[in-house]
């Protein structure tokens, strides 16, 4: 049972998240041969003030 955890910054539309789940599932099914029904995709959206790169929060960089 593959479990794929995707972390991204907030701001994607519901349609984009739906497509992400579909495409990640397709890729895992194709590359691992796992049964589609056993593939789990978990999306965690992070607030921009909870994520930093090079010492700067994404919310401060905009």
Swiss-Prot record:
Disulfide bonds: none annotated. Keywords: Isomerase. It comes from Staphylococcus haemolyticus (strain JCSC1435). Its EC number is 5.3.2.-. GO terms for molecular function: isomerase activity. It comes from the Bacteria. PANTHER family: 2-HYDROXYMUCONATE TAUTOMERASE, TAUTOMERASE-RELATED. This is Probable tautomerase SH1546. Pfam families: Tautomerase (PF01361). CDD domains: 4Oxalocrotonate_Tautomerase. SUPFAM superfamilies: Tautomerase/MIF. The keyword Isomerase applies. NCBIfam families: PRK02220.1 (NF002571), taut (TIGR00013). The lineage of its organism: Bacteria, Bacillati, Bacillota, Bacilli, Bacillales. The active site is at residue 2. Belongs to the 4-oxalocrotonate tautomerase family. InterPro entries: 4-OT (IPR018191), 4-OT-like_dom (IPR004370), Tautomerase/MIF_sf (IPR014347).
């Amino acid at each position: 049972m593959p479990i794929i955890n995707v972390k991204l910054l907030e701001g994607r539309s519901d349609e984009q998240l739906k497509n992400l789940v579909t495409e990640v599932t397709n890729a895992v099914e194709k590359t691992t041969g796992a049964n589609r029904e056993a593939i789990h995709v978990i999306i965690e959206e992070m607030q921009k003030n909870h994520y930093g790169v090079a010492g700067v929060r994404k919310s401060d960089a905009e």
